[in-house]
């Protein structure tokens, strides 16, 4: 972006001009007054007729000069004030247009080369800067919508087989974020689950996130086991990673016919699992492995468990447990578990929305600097292709 030269408006020069005009006008009046007094003194000292007549003429001429000076001064002052008033009104209208978001196409033009024209230049520079920020904001809003469109929503969740229920939520800390979640049917009997967190925020992280999501889904769609998927994705992300991003991730595959779940993780927080309706949640601990895009050729260990009907798995990114309040305290994994246990019987979507409300209440309005993503799946049992 081209750097613009900032202009400094010298308001003091306006005051100086007024003072100069005032002293010039005052000086002329003093000179004329002194001349009149001198003539009068001479007339008193020499009361001759011719001297008195000359004095009268001189006084009349001096008085006329004073009147002319005053008239011209007021005319000049009126024209000066009128020019400033018109220019200031134009500036006011121009700034009101900018303030309403309707940026004028043409720059503000005020001729004269004085402080008013300098002020107009400053306003034009401000308009260009605001236009650029507004353009960037609009582009980020479009990027946010595109990113949201890449993630499966309620419609995708309703299309899943009756043997499972899924709810998810993502709230980026900036306009676009580096978190991702995904759920999809690998085939009629197998459900794929993904949650991941890129090591940065904003547009670059969002682009890296999109690449990560595509690589994971493409490999899982081929029926590749989760551990091998992470290995392939890790090597792929390392091929062109000049920014030095890394990704924490958890991916799983559930056989909806029998509840068998294979999963692997890459440095991600442990999920919570609930075995049976009304049961307490416990961390689903496993080998955390290395983050993605961390080291080439790393082999990711895969874990397996069997889910029974009514079992749930709750996945999240560290934007949940590391959310902070006004005293700089963390929400923490303990509060996450407490909320899950207290709402063990609630619908997955209600658990997700309620957890978000609990975090917002805890933060008490403090701005959060990390993306927040959650995903919950409940295995209902039965055939995957019902």
Specify the residue positions occupied by each region the protein language model found:
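HAMP exit helix and analogous amphipathic coiled-coil linker helices
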Residues: 102, 116, 125-140
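HAMP signal relay modules and closely related sensory coiled-coil linkers
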Residues: 79, 83-97, 105-126
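Flexible, glycine-biased helix-capping/connector loops in cytosolic signal-transduction modules
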Residues: 94, 98-104, 189, 296
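Non-catalytic regulatory/interaction regions at protein termini and inter-domain linkers
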Residues: 1-11, 43, 349-361, 374-375, ...
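Alpha-helical transmembrane segments and their helix-membrane boundary motifs
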Residues: 1-89
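Active-site-proximal, acidic helix/loop segment immediately C-terminal to a metal-coordinating Asp/Glu
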Residues: 203-222, 307, 311-366, 383
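… and, occasionally, acidic/histidine-rich disordered N-termini of signaling adaptors
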Residues: 131-312, 366-386
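The cytosolic transmitter module of two-component sensor histidine kinases
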Residues: 84, 112-119, 136, 162, ...
